[in-house]
């Protein structure tokens, strides 16, 4: 199995370098890659940067160059639910844009010609032995499933949070990359899963203590998934 990993931060890339055997640096047209092995699996890691365009470009280049069997994205997200707190981990089970509007005849957040929401079935996960189920079993009680909103906005305003929750009541978290990666994987017919650690409650600036440990927390989750899938 070949696993493509899109990481959010440079420190996360640095942590993964020490975990991958036979690692070597390679260069695409836009992005740099770390290529190696975890157990029997081939692994390709890329730091794509923040936002919808960066993440879509990163996913497209990775899929084109390396043809991974599935793509895993790690990073952080803000919580839209009162019972989902900083430091908790979620696995996305559907992905939807919150800042797209293509006309009244379409669902808010739907890109014309695309599904209104990208789900595991639509991006091919069920063809890979229920990948979401496998990852859920690996992380067990340490992970929650969630609907993910994405847009080019870092949400720290209570009014924006309330508007998002009112418009998309089933969504639990918001980030800036997951849905654009899901859309890219949908177009390329490559399975995709996003794992996100909750950074804040979307109502205030991120917690200082959280940012001291987030890379290590995210690395631990990614490492465990790769170990168990290997």
Task: Set out the residue ranges of the language-model regions.
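Proline-aspartate-enriched helix->loop->beta-strand connector
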Residues: 67-72
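A C-terminal functional module that forms or caps the active site or interfaces directly
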Residues: 154-204
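N-terminal short beta-loop-beta anion/metal-coordinating cradle
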Residues: 1-66
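Active-site-proximal beta-strand elements of phosphoester/diester hydrolases
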Residues: 44-48, 147-149, 195
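Regulatory input/activation interfaces that engage signals or partners
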Residues: 192, 197-230
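Mid-sequence, gly/pro-rich, charge-dense loop/helix-turn segments that line enzyme active sites
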Residues: 80-168
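Short, acidic/turn-prone active-site loops that include or flank metal/cofactor-
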Residues: 29-31, 50, 94-97, 197-200
